[in-house]
Amino acid sequence: MESLNKFKLLMAEIGEVLKATSVVQFENGYWVIEYGESELVWIYYHVEDDSFTLSAEAGNIQEQDQLELFKFFLHFNALGQEQRTVKTALSGKGDSCMLLGDHSATSLSTLDFSGIFFSFAEQLIHWRYLLKSWPTATSEDKQKMQENISFMNPHLVRA
């Protein structure tokens, strides 16, 4: 529980560092950070391995695009599997895409957390653009969007 208490202290300080609208703890291990214009990032702290997960809704996937995007998600997730970097996941509804980032909390400082958070928020912007633009994009445009995300530096989101 000592590691959870350290993480709670970090979360108590992080709002000011991030210039967040609010940081709210809902129960042991669960927080939400609100920033910008009602942007929400959820945080879950894993006591068993002293790590945390960031999650945010990236957008919706139209039914006709699901197969094509699912293949891309599998490829993207496989690249980040060993590095514990941002990966995509789909909600139970089948059309809502969540962006997740798993990170170690061991020896985590507020500066480390803010870097992880801002990198996550940056990738969220890219994913939202991809999902919004996908239905009307040409094959060439889709390829460029995939390359832009595939070439993101995975070390930017490592703890």
Task: Describe the function of each predicted region.
Residues 10, 14, 66-75, 117-120:
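Short, Φ-rich (hydrophobic/aromatic) sequence segments
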Residues 132-159:
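Short, highly charged C-terminal tails/helix-capping segments
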Residues 31, 50-52, 95-97:
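Hydrophobic residues embedded in beta-strands of well-ordered beta-sheets
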Residues 1-42:
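Charge-rich, low-complexity N-terminal segments
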Residues 27, 46-48, 93:
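Structural motif
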Residues 42-45, 50-62:
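A short acidic-to-branched-hydrophobic micro-motif
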